[in-house]
């Protein structure tokens, strides 16, 4: 039984999703968005850190998974996104959680079956997979997708090796 916190980082809106895995079953525990306020980037990063830290305290996850930075058209946006990811990763590290990272293509492939899926397709499949009454908000759905991707990746590793491994700090342990 593992609880996984998935995060879809953003400097303005950071989505989070929490699932519990019981064997092959994935149960929805919660999801939402951390909406930062103000123009001051350091303050927004603190809000992300504090928000993720509170979610960790509330749900007590065993594992943490986050979306990797994608190539943005605007270099400034990519840097801000990287800093938002850093704030979330530090919150997980402070809580001694193993950190796993996945590309958007890996996440979409795990959830929808194709790495080129649209946001609406991810929302729909998350609703179906987790048996939700309605599709979650886009950022929350993406975060739940990160958690589902992490679950499926670990299940594949278990099947291949007979034991689970988690990617942490760029290495497996």
From Swiss-Prot:
A molecular function annotated in GO for this UniProt entry is: magnesium ion binding
Query: Which residue positions are annotated as catalytic?
Result: 8, 67, 139
Q: Which residues cross the membrane?
A: none
Alphabetical GO CC annotations of the entry are:
cytoplasm; Holliday junction resolvase complex
Q: Which cofactor does it need?
A: Mg(2+)
Give the reaction(s) catalysed.
Answer: Endonucleolytic cleavage at a junction such as a reciprocal single-stranded crossover between two homologous DNA duplexes (Holliday junction)
Q: Where in the cell is it found?
A: Cytoplasm
Keyword Lipid metabolism appears in the UniProt entry: no
Question: Where on this chain does Mg(2+) 2 bind?
Answer: 67
- Which InterPro entries does the record cross-reference, listed alphabetically? RNaseH-like_sf (IPR012337), RNaseH_sf (IPR036397), X-over_junc_endoDNase_Mg_BS (IPR020563), X-over_junc_endoDNase_RuvC (IPR002176)
UniProt protein name: Crossover junction endodeoxyribonuclease RuvC
What's the source species for this entry? Shewanella sp. (strain ANA-3)
Protein encoded by which gene = ruvC
């Amino acid at each position: 039984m593992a609880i996984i916190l998935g995060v879809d980082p953003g400097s303005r809106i950071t989505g989070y999703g929490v699932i519990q895995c019981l064997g092959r079953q994935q149960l929805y525990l919660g999801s939402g968005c951390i909406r930062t306020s103000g123009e001051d980037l350091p303050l927004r990063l603190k809000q992300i850190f504090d928000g993720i830290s509170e979610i960790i305290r509330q749900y007590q996850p065993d594992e943490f998974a986050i979306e990797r930075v994608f190539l943005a058209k605007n270099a400034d946006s990519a840097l801000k996104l990287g800093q938002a990811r850093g704030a979330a990763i530090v919150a997980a590290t402070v809580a001694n959680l193993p950190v796993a990272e996945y590309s958007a293509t890996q996440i979409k492939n795990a959830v929808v079956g194709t790495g080129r899926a649209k946001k609406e397709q991810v929302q729909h499949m998350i609703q179906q997979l987790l048996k939700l009454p309605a599709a979650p908000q886009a950022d929350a759905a993406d975060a739940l997708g990160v958690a589902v991707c992490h679950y499926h990746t670990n299940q594949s590793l278990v099947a291949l090796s007979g034991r689970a491994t988690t990617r942490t700090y760029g290495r497996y342990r």
